[in-house]
Amino acid sequence: MLIGAHADDDALSHGTLAMLQAHGNQVYVVTLTTGNVGTQDPKLSRTQLAEIRRQEELAALKELGIPGEHYINLGYDDGLLEFEDRKAVVENLVRWIRKLRPDVLFAWDPGKNFQRWHKSDHRAAAYLAADAARAAMWRLLFEGQITQEGLREFMIPEYMFYNDYDHQDENVWVDISDFVEKRVNADAHYISQYGPGWKNYNPNPSEAEIKVMKDGALDAIRTRDGKRIEGFRYYRGLPDAIGK
């Protein structure tokens, strides 16, 4: 299960998610916002952009082999996540954690021994995911989900935290060499977010524009010991100690 703020936040883990799905795991992606603000194209409304972002994410996940019904969008406004009712958002996430009961949670890294810097929605998503993971294990937190909805408390045993600014706390590097093509093809579906679509959205970019996007996606994949990798801060244990 991955929890992110926006429809492309999972891109930092696309190779790993594709590998997990290919090996028989059931991967779910939970996006907190609709992505309905992040454009410089004056022709797009919030409603239009939200639908574009949804379709782009579904297309990207399809490239990774992840079914469309495994994509869950919680519908919050882009850019304002930290101003939402925090308790309500955590309760919403707890519900999905208790429903899906994931073996591993992928999320923005909230930080180790300090609060890691992320831009606003990413910062909020990091801590909302961590707080929801902790709350989900306690039966008397959001107990209506248990007494009225038939869910059960659940503790996520393992965590894979990602970060896009620096990698100093990484301790696990996943070899995605066999899934590079899937990651590149998936990333190329984010037309409204990368390349010329950022300022002038065109749902049918030229072959040259697609090539530029794919080249950029390939260049963004890191190399370690001659292998294409994605890096994470791996943690196993009680949610209380996620940041230690």
Specify the residue positions occupied by each region the protein language model found:
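Metal-dependent de-N-acetylase/amidase catalytic core
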Residues: 1, 23, 87-244
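Active-site rim/loop-helix segments in enzyme catalytic domains that contact anionic ligands
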Residues: 1-100, 241
